[in-house]
Amino acid sequence: MEKELKKILSILIAMMLSVSLMACVKAADSQTQTKEEDNLLSGKHHVTITVQDYGDINVELDADVAPITVTNFINLANDGFYDGLTFHRIIKGFMIQGGDPLGNGTGGSDNKIKGEFSNNGIENNLSHTRGAISMARSSNNDSASSQFFIVHKDSTYLDGNYACFGYVTDGMDIVDKICANVKATDDNGTVAKNNQPVITKIAVID
């Protein structure tokens, strides 16, 4: 009987600890979200993506439509996160994708962000037309971190499912050259490591 009581007591203690840990995690999430909201950008912002051996791609970002996405992207750029990374996935007629520190589509930054698109409960009227910049993600709507893609040809079927956050204002000829010159190793657009175009820097203009 005594052994059974001890066993029940240990189970109850374990359950209480589990609940307290969950409460701590929820509190931390709430504090992080509040902090993010307090520091979100607004308005239009501009960045230049310099690609080694190709040139500059100038992009206008819309923080009024996608404040979480733009703020995250600009913070990473200002921290130098993208410097030296690559475009690891290229599909001519669709898009070029980069921003993965592992260079294989599985990596990202330490921070995952809310997916700002309609099928995730957030209004976003930016369309995935030629020149759009948008966040790559996994099947989890809130899994985007650092990987982004630039649309090569109109792909409006992506609207509502991916967080478009701006458009190329100058340099689509660079995207055209990358799509024309870089050959993928499979139908998924995988580019061999030694052939991946290098992002020298993403400079934040304003």
Regions found by a protein language model. Name each.
Residues 5-12, 18-206:
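Cyclophilin-like peptidyl-prolyl cis-trans isomerases
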